[in-house]
């Protein structure tokens, strides 16, 4: 059982023109795939999906998707937003199958930022989400990045983070130890020091 429920209708009218007509009627196109079943094109009421994803946790939780009354558990795989206005234009969902791993993007929560700031550091968040691979039951709501012990000059990489039990960082599994955040000296101070040295 999930706290996140979304209603949808099967869609047969496909193509760019059809998608445009959908958006004009306050609906959005979507697709659900995976789980050894055919991909299915969907129509979702724009207001419903916008309301659901006002809650950040919906991005990293199992969603009960009701397609014409038939229920299936899914996670959001990708979402396309309007570049200027930010509203949702299209969504991709993946069916959840018990015992099978899925990949999903999970939000990053930064904590302990006060400590490096007090030491004169400025913090740059390099990522806002991390792609993980795990079973649906292990899908974390977010990944916590603790900056309380970070010094000026510190770069936090994926390998510095503790993955929750049963969870794997996709980039790290492919040998890509991405930077997540860094603590650097304030730019103004650095420029002043450079000027004094000249």
UniProtKB/Swiss-Prot annotation:
GO molecular function: 5S rRNA binding; structural constituent of ribosome
Record's protein name: Large ribosomal subunit protein bL25
Gene Ontology annotations of biological process type: translation
Species lineage: Bacteria, Pseudomonadati, Pseudomonadota, Gammaproteobacteria, Pseudomonadales
GO cellular component, as recorded: cytosolic large ribosomal subunit
Role according to the record: This is one of the proteins that binds to the 5S RNA in the ribosome where it forms part of the central protuberance.
Keyword set, alphabetical order: Ribonucleoprotein, Ribosomal protein, RNA-binding, rRNA-binding
One protein family per Pfam: Ribosomal_TL5_C
Oligomer and partners: Part of the 50S ribosomal subunit; part of the 5S rRNA/L5/L18/L25 subcomplex. Contacts the 5S rRNA. Binds to the 5S rRNA independently of L5 and L18.
Family: Belongs to the bacterial ribosomal protein bL25 family. CTC subfamily.
């Amino acid at each position: 059982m999930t706290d996140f429920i979304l209603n949808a209708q099967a869609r047969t009218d496909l193509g760019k023109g059809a998608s445009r007509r959908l958006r004009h009627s306050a609906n959005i196109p979507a697709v659900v795939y995976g789980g050894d079943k055919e991909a299915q094109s969907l129509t979702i009421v724009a207001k419903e999906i916008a309301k659901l994803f006002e809650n950040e946790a919906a991005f990293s939780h199992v969603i009960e998707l009701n397609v014409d009354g038939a229920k299936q558990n899914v996670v959001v795989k990708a979402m396309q937003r309007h570049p200027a206005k930010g509203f949702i234009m299209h969504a991709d969902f993946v069916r959840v199958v018990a015992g099978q791993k899925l990949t999903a993007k999970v939000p990053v929560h930064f904590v302990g930022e006060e400590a490096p700031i007090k030491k004169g550091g400025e913090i740059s968040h390099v990522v806002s989400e991390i792609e993980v691979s795990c079973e649906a039951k292990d899908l974390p709501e977010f990944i916590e990045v603790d900056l309380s012990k970070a010094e000026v000059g510190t770069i936090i990489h994926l390998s510095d983070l503790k993955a929750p039990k049963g969870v794997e960082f996709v980039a790290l599994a492919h040998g890509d130890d991405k930077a997540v955040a860094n603590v650097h000296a304030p730019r103004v101070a650095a420029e002043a020091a450079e000027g004094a040295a000249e």
